[in-house]
Amino acid sequence: KALEDKGVKDGSIGIVNINNSTNTAIQREAGFREAFEGTDYELLETQFCEGDAAKAQTIAENYITEGVVGIYGTNEGASTGVGNAIKASGSDEIIGVGFDKSDTLKGLIEDGYLVCTMAQNPDQMGKLGVQACIKALNGEDLGGEVTDTGVSVLTKESLAEDGVEETEEAADADDAEEET
């Protein structure tokens, strides 16, 4: 959407991932790639930073040199590197998005170097985790169930409102928890 809002309908997009063995990062990348299927954007070969923001910045700077229209970082280190590379480039044409939540990422969003970051909901994760532990300690069968605790999208607007835009999944997880 951010690309379309800038009138960019095609171009190359870089991906900076942690590594090729961290399951959550692999899934994040797969979802990102899936979102671009059937579009005119070319997703470049993923580069790995091992979670190191400085290495991620170098990777992102190389993508920028190649002329990408956007870059995605799959974790805090990768996202920080992406934002710092966009900042260093001086360009306001490159769209940067990330994953995870930190004061550094919030600053990069507020300063306009990242459009947004997807943040897990640690309070919800902790709350539901403790509830599951209590059930298990009481001998209840958890059935191997996976609980989606949702994700929140942090944008310049939501940060200015000192709030968070919840996805439907996060709202559904809250509703399910209230019913319990």
Model-derived segments and spans:
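Hydrophobic alpha-helical segments within soluble ligand-binding/sensing domains
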Residues: K1-D10, A56-Q57, K101-L105, Q120-N138
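Short beta-strand elements in bilobed, periplasmic/extracellular small-molecule ligand-binding domains
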Residues: S12-N17, R33-A53
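Hinge/cleft segment of the Venus flytrap/periplasmic-binding protein
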Residues: S12, V16-N20, T24, A35, ...
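Solvent-exposed, acidic/flexible segments
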Residues: S21-A25, C49, A53, I71-N75, ...
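Short, solvent-exposed amphipathic alpha-helices that sit
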Residues: N23-E42, G81, A85, M125
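Structural recognition of the beta-strand scaffold that forms the well-ordered cores
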Residues: G11-V16, E45-T46, G70-G73, I95-F99, ...
